[in-house]
């Protein structure tokens, strides 16, 4: 799918090659092989699809029997879950969620936490499995103290795919200190409030692709520490937008690529946010972005006032490439499509903005503003960062080629915070003109194995120097 000849690879920039996955991602053993070893059906452990009986104990018992090789199987049906599960250890295991789990109970924490595991898979064989967090029951009273839906800590060689995460009381999906992960074919749908992050990543060697997020905070966001992160075919559908940060002390992020990101009615197309702090971000590519109706477009803000100032001169940003951005922004005079604000004592260096064409939906002018950002393109200045500057450029003519496609599933309004959010169907398209890397599970002639085979093939192609 992205297989290139050695000659073609030699012509690629070092930045693009280096900012790739560092090796294999995803589980080492197929789910079918795990199932043939052992299958632990939660209904054999007391689970009832009555939307009342807590499924937590049944999952724990099934996990105890299948964690060292096998599949915990949750059949189709509606299940209640008042427990907060911490599933620890295990190898060559999987959780197959073909039913729908409804969060009950008022405890915080994590609905599911998987930790210290390897060769793991969390998936639906039908693409109809879901976790319904019913977060509105907290949010209608102004509370964000409910549980996160799905968190991974210290897990290696794993995947999450073909499931929907809906209306989390807090964050939806977090990858904390993990390695060699693949996240794909997902729909995440949250309320119209901050603090309801879609996908948060502070890990190593992670491939996120073909994911739709609706919320009002992070779409797919990289936090520190992180390296070798590839994010592709992302649909931020009335969301906060993709981002990096917030960044604080001892930031350590490198070799990150975002590619094919479509953003509709969100806070930003991409934001890097910090205020003080220390450490660095290096080797970042942001390419093939389409946006419509967003408040901000490219927003690099080293003095972000929405976070408290962190001790330090600032986070050093170096070697950032922004290319092939198209579309429109909400109001280009109030919030221009390019904002690069870097700390005077930690200027941004080696930034390139190329093939960037966005135009305002309101009025007939827009601004490009840069402060202590050095490189090439628009308001950036040449230099090595030894001198400071601040400049604003006003543009009154629409750039050539800014027109861009839209998506047929663009939402007409946000989901609120005081009523249940419906479970969505996982889409089959996440970026205009881009084909998902893997068919939805259960799609091709009802054969989930075809989707699994496609996913496995694409995983092994994504190694350093083979993309």
From Swiss-Prot:
InterPro entries cross-referenced by the UniProt entry: Glyco_hydro_28, Pectin_lyas_fold, Pectin_lyase_fold/virulence
Entry annotation: catalytic residues: 217, 292
This protein's GO CC annotations: extracellular region
Location(s), subcellular: Secreted
Record-level Gene Ontology MF annotations: polygalacturonase activity; rhamnogalacturonan alpha-L-rhamnopyranosyl-(1->4)-alpha-D-galactopyranosyluronide lyase activity
Cystine pairs: 40-66, 219-236, 342-348, 370-379
EC number: 3.2.1.171
UniProtKB keywords: Carbohydrate metabolism, Cell wall biogenesis/degradation, Disulfide bond, Glycoprotein, Glycosidase, Hydrolase, Polysaccharide degradation, Secreted, Signal
Glycosylation sites: 237, 252, 319
GO BP terms in the entry: cell wall organization; pectin catabolic process
Signal peptide coordinates: 1-19
Catalysed reactions listed for this entry: Endohydrolysis of alpha-D-GalA-(1->2)-alpha-L-Rha glycosidic bond in the rhamnogalacturonan I backbone with initial inversion of anomeric configuration releasing oligosaccharides with beta-D-GalA at the reducing end
Protein purpose: Pectinolytic enzymes consist of four classes of enzymes: pectine lyase, polygalacturonase, pectin methylesterase and rhamnogalacturonase. Hydrolyzes alpha-D-galacturonopyranosyl-(1,2)-alpha-L-rhamnopyranosyl linkages in the backbone of the hairy regions of pectins.
Family: Belongs to the glycosyl hydrolase 28 family.
Protein name: Probable rhamnogalacturonase A
Native source species: Aspergillus flavus (strain ATCC 200026 / FGSC A1120 / IAM 13836 / NRRL 3357 / JCM 12722 / SRRC 167)
């Amino acid at each position: 799918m992205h297989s290139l000849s050695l000659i073609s690879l030699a012509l690629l920039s070092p930045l693009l090659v280096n900012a790739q996955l560092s090796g294999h991602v995803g589980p080492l053993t197929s789910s079918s092989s795990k199932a043939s070893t052992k299958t632990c059906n939660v209904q054999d452990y007391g689970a009832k699809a009555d939307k009342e009986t807590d499924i937590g104990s049944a999952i724990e018992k099934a996990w105890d029997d299948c964690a060292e090789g096998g599949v915990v199987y949750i059949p189709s049906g509606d299940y209640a879950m008042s427990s907060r599960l911490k599933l620890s250890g295990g190898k060559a295991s999987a959780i197959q969620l073909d039913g729908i789990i409804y969060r009950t109970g008022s405890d915080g924490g994590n609905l599911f936490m998987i930790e210290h595991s390897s060769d793991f898979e969390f998936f639906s064989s039908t693409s109809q499995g879901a976790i319904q967090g019913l977060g509105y029951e907290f949010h209608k009273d102004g509370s964000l103290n409910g549980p996160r839906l799905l968190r991974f800590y210290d897990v290696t060689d794993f995947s999450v795919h073909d499931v929907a995460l809906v209306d989390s009381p807090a964050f939806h999906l977090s990858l904390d200190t993990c390695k060699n992960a693949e996240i794909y074919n997902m729909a995440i749908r949250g309320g119209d409030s901050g603090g309801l992050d879609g996908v948060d990543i502070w890990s190593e060697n992670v491939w996120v692709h073909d994911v739709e997020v609706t919320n009002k905070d992070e779409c797919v966001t990289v936090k520190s520490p992180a390296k070798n992160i590839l994010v592709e075919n992302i649909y931020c559908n009335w969301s906060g937008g993709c981002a990096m940060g917030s960044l604080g002390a001892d930031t350590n992020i490198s070799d990150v690529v975002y590619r094919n990101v479509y953003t509709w009615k969100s806070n930003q197309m991409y934001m890097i946010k910090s205020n003080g702090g220390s450490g660095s971000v290096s080797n970042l590519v942001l390419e093939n972005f389409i946006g419509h109706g967003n408040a901000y477009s490219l927003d690099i803000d080293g003095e972000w006032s929405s976070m408290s100032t962190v001790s330090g001169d600032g986070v050093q940003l170096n070697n950032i490439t922004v290319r092939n951005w198209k579309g429109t922004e909400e109001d280009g005079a109030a919030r221009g499509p390019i904002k690069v604000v870097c700390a005077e004592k930690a200027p941004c260096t080696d930034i390139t903005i190329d093939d960037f064409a966005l135009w305002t939906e309101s009025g007939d002018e827009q601004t490009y503003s840069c402060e202590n950002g050095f490189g090439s393109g628009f308001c950036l200045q040449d230099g090595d960062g030894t001198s400071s500057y601040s400049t604003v450029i006003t543009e009154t003519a629409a750039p050539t080629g800014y027109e861009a496609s839209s998506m047929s599933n663009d939402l007409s309004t946000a989901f609120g915070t005081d009523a249940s959010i419906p479970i969505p169907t996982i889409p089959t398209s996440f970026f205009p003109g881009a084909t998902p890397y893997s068919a939805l599970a259960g799609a091709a002639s009802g054969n989930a194995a075809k989707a699994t085979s496609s996913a496995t093939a694409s995983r092994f192609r994504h190694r350093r120097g083979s993309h």
